[in-house]
């Protein structure tokens, strides 16, 4: 067996679109940029393309490293590359930074052509369906009429699912990992707490903080801390941190004492240093609004009737943010419609973030699934 390798040094590309993009919120984006990366080679038949959809804080940088920043490794580098589950010797892999993002695609930090200033909070609300429409236009630009597969975890899984409903004829296979057909009330509640942390930060300035030369770092830090708790499992937090005290004994202060406090503050500070608060607000609302069954009276069976792809649905036993029960809802609806679907529930202790990790059972499953896809 070939030893897995990195795709090596990569470089992002930018596609500009002049054609207005109608949005589900009622607005229109007159023109926009999408930043993307590709790995592997598109075959002569243009039949080996795989789209990887990112989650809330992800980006187009799925695999490889940048020449000027070799420590910036793609967020799914353990999965994508020669000899890896998503093998770039076989597939042409595409990663896209979605609209509203903060990694180069048009978003709140971009200039609003109507005002000459950053969009800020005036950037229109975007939905998963809008993202998929924009991705489809990029596929057209690249000459890809049909994807061999579309894959994503968490919010990325929602995009993969939406692709099979919006463009069923353009998707051969879909992998929906650690995802759900819609958010629960509890999930929406977590997102709202995170948003309020940002919205009430004095440096938020109604979303126009760019013009003030500040960022709502305190709010974004707290939002990330709240979110990060939900990405981990109780068992994994207990095993990694337990009740360990940084100083060996209690010092009775509001400063950092427990190791888990130190970890959360570190993650929050790091996130606030590179992510955009408006993008966070926008993307959590995108999550909240996703509900393909809504226009079918809440009937998921009816909503998924349009799908024709072969599916892989994956959940993780300790994921309480998007529990296995939510994945099974998708599976049951697909089976009701007599679609080809494989389901796996992976026993992994890491919680929701398991879909990002190098779990042997998980990767073996994905390798076998991708191996069976004919291009």
Swiss-Prot record:
<feature type="active site">
    <location>
        <position position="352"/>
    </location>
</feature>
<dbReference type="GO" id="GO:0004414">
    <property type="term" value="F:homoserine O-acetyltransferase activity"/>
</dbReference>
<keyword id="KW-0808">Transferase</keyword>
<keyword id="KW-0486">Methionine biosynthesis</keyword>
<dbReference type="InterPro" id="IPR008220">
    <property type="entry name" value="HAT_MetX-like"/>
</dbReference>
<dbReference type="Pfam" id="PF00561">
    <property type="entry name" value="Abhydrolase_1"/>
</dbReference>
<dbReference type="GO" id="GO:0005737">
    <property type="term" value="C:cytoplasm"/>
</dbReference>
<protein>
    <recommendedName>
        <fullName>Homoserine O-succinyltransferase</fullName>
        <ecNumber>2.3.1.46</ecNumber>
    </recommendedName>
</protein>
<keyword id="KW-0012">Acyltransferase</keyword>
<dbReference type="GO" id="GO:0009086">
    <property type="term" value="P:methionine biosynthetic process"/>
</dbReference>
<comment type="function">
    <text>Transfers a succinyl group from succinyl-CoA to L-homoserine, forming succinyl-L-homoserine.</text>
</comment>
<feature type="active site">
    <location>
        <position position="319"/>
    </location>
</feature>
<comment type="similarity">
    <text>Belongs to the AB hydrolase superfamily. MetX family.</text>
</comment>
<dbReference type="GO" id="GO:0009092">
    <property type="term" value="P:homoserine metabolic process"/>
</dbReference>
<keyword id="KW-0963">Cytoplasm</keyword>
<feature type="binding site">
    <location>
        <position position="353"/>
    </location>
    <ligand>
        <name>substrate</name>
    </ligand>
</feature>
<feature type="site" description="Important for acyl-CoA specificity">
    <location>
        <position position="321"/>
    </location>
</feature>
<feature type="domain" description="AB hydrolase-1">
    <location>
        <begin position="48"/>
        <end position="358"/>
    </location>
</feature>
<keyword id="KW-0028">Amino-acid biosynthesis</keyword>
<dbReference type="GO" id="GO:0008899">
    <property type="term" value="F:homoserine O-succinyltransferase activity"/>
</dbReference>
<feature type="binding site">
    <location>
        <position position="224"/>
    </location>
    <ligand>
        <name>substrate</name>
    </ligand>
</feature>
<dbReference type="InterPro" id="IPR000073">
    <property type="entry name" value="AB_hydrolase_1"/>
</dbReference>
<comment type="pathway">
    <text>Amino-acid biosynthesis; L-methionine biosynthesis via de novo pathway; O-succinyl-L-homoserine from L-homoserine: step 1/1.</text>
</comment>
<comment type="subunit">
    <text>Homodimer.</text>
</comment>
<feature type="active site" description="Nucleophile">
    <location>
        <position position="154"/>
    </location>
</feature>
<dbReference type="InterPro" id="IPR029058">
    <property type="entry name" value="AB_hydrolase_fold"/>
</dbReference>
